[in-house]
Amino acid sequence: MACNTLVNSWGDYDYWFHTHVWFLKSFAEPGNTLPFLYTQKDRGIIDFNEERDYVLTYVLSDFRGNEVRYSFTVRGEKTEIPEPVQEEGTIFRWNQTNSYSLPGMHLIVPYGLLTKNTLLTPTSKARQGKLSDSYSFYPTSCPLVTSGEISFYVNKDVDASKVYVACDGVFAGGDYQDGWVTGRVNDLGAWYGLAYDDEAPEVTPVSLGDHIVLKLTDTKSGVASYRATIDGRFVVFDKVDKKPLVTCDLSETPIRKTLRTHQLRFTAIDNRNNEQVFETNIIY
């Protein structure tokens, strides 16, 4: 998983995020540990420090030894380097564990989750009637190598087992300890806040024939698991890709076709342990 997300650092992720065009960098960021990247101590960064032509050649080869070369010339010209502009914000450094706190909120990004120094620009939005404000830490998408942590203090008298951290409205964990609820942070540019879910998922029959189709919906913490039995015997329901549906082909279950009545019991549980039981009779 870490290697997959490290590819974001090897490419120009910000350009891809805005254009969906992917370019690879000719250098490695200091915290990029992709095992197939090899550079010298300069990490592939070229210092054009003379007024002359520099001929660069890129060689791309595959495992069969086929290769293609592309050469081009960069003309070195003396240029005045402007003074760096001091931007406001908090710098998270790639080579250490970083943290950031506000009243009732604490963010931790452990060592190894950033591939370069990153300037945080924390932003908050007030949410009237909610358990917390919402927070974002970067002006655009900024994925981490793996998950960091964000914690919120629960300052209202509610059932803590129903509180969770939402990331852009999607469940992102909810471990409660000593008044704090902790969830996952995968992208510093997403919005995080507390949410509450004491409502069970909905189970709606779509088809109850030989091929059973049920619709599962949960608009808050999301469905975590489900289990089904027919006449007390376990049967498998498969999820349908990109749709809130689960299906069961009765011909692939232990239930024999006798054209008699059978009882289907389907239990769905969401990420805050709210449970919905759907029962019906089917003829098979």
Regions found by a protein language model. Give the residues of each.
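Long, low-complexity serine/threonine/glycine- and acidic-rich segments characteristic of extracellular
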Residues: 1-77, 173, 183, 219-284
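Proline-centered linker/hinge motifs at extracellular inter-domain junctions
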Residues: 198-202, 223
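Predominantly extracellular/luminal regions of secreted and cell-surface proteins
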Residues: 94-120
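Proteolytic-maturation and junctional protease-sensitive modules
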Residues: 139-194, 234
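Short edge beta-strand/loop segments characteristic of extracellular beta-sandwich folds
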Residues: 149-153, 211-219
